[in-house]
Amino acid sequence: MSRIAERFRACRSAGRTALIPYITGGDPSPDDTVRLMHALVAGGADVIEIGVPFSDPMADGPVIQAACARALAAGTTPARLFEVVRRFREEDPDTPVVFMGYANILEAAGYRAFVRDAAAAGVDGLLTVDLPPEEAGALADEARVQGVDLIYLVAPNTSAERVERVCSVAGGFVYAVALKGVTGSADLDAGLVGQQVAGIRRVTDLPVAVGFGVRDPQSAAALAPCADGVIVGSALVRMIGEHGAAADLPERLRDAVLALRRAMDDTTTGGDS
């Protein structure tokens, strides 16, 4: 069983929803990312999602676009992020790590080489925003060999037939996009998200995690009862952008994640975490 599957099983046994924070790898620097990953875990993260910076992150809003620019300016490359994960794994062999990126990044390295290097570093899952399952044959083959889960997005307007097709080849968990638009978009409707998650669950036993538009503890808490995981990105990336030079950035990030964790637990476990 993969680290991702183990973690979701543990969360389910504990009666809590998995918290999946996202940060952009290399922002403000690759060295900082190692420290920030440990801070996320200290705050209660169950899975960590790392964005691989790209010069044209079309699915991302201005906050993450700016983070990608900062990371690239700091010299971040996929190879340096693999080293970040290796260093993280020296102290944390258990927390699942998912890379989120764009097809051009993987194509530049070669699908097989990228997956092989990711697995060797300790990456558990890959989410390629702009690579549909029909075009992921070589990537899927190598991911299967290396034991890396391929995670796919399901949008609110995805047809039932398409949802079933995506779920049939997905691994790890299904990423349910809670809003149309880019990351960091505005208001969520928890009722509609709950219906979306229920539709996905009708065709797969994989955990369903919800992201896009989760901005604060209140919105995370609202979604926690209807999903297996809640993904929070832009709010944390914004904090890193505002306080990147602060010596206490890891503590600030830890406390922000802890607030999310407590709010979610209050709605799913009665506050017992």
Swiss-Prot record:
Disulfide bonds: none
CDD domains: Tryptophan_synthase_alpha
PROSITE patterns: TRP_SYNTHASE_ALPHA (PS00167)
Superkingdom assignment: Bacteria
Keyword annotations: Amino-acid biosynthesis, Aromatic amino acid biosynthesis, Lyase, Tryptophan biosynthesis
Keyword Transport: no
EC assignment: 4.2.1.20
Pathway: Amino-acid biosynthesis; L-tryptophan biosynthesis; L-tryptophan from chorismate: step 5/5
Reactions accelerated catalytically: (1S,2R)-1-C-(indol-3-yl)glycerol 3-phosphate + L-serine = D-glyceraldehyde 3-phosphate + L-tryptophan + H2O
Subunit structure, as described in the record: Tetramer of two alpha and two beta chains.
Family membership noted in the UniProt record: Belongs to the TrpA family.
Its biological purpose: The alpha subunit is responsible for the aldol cleavage of indoleglycerol phosphate to indole and glyceraldehyde 3-phosphate.
Protein name listed in UniProt: Tryptophan synthase alpha chain
Organism (species): Halorhodospira halophila (strain DSM 244 / SL1)
Underlying gene: trpA
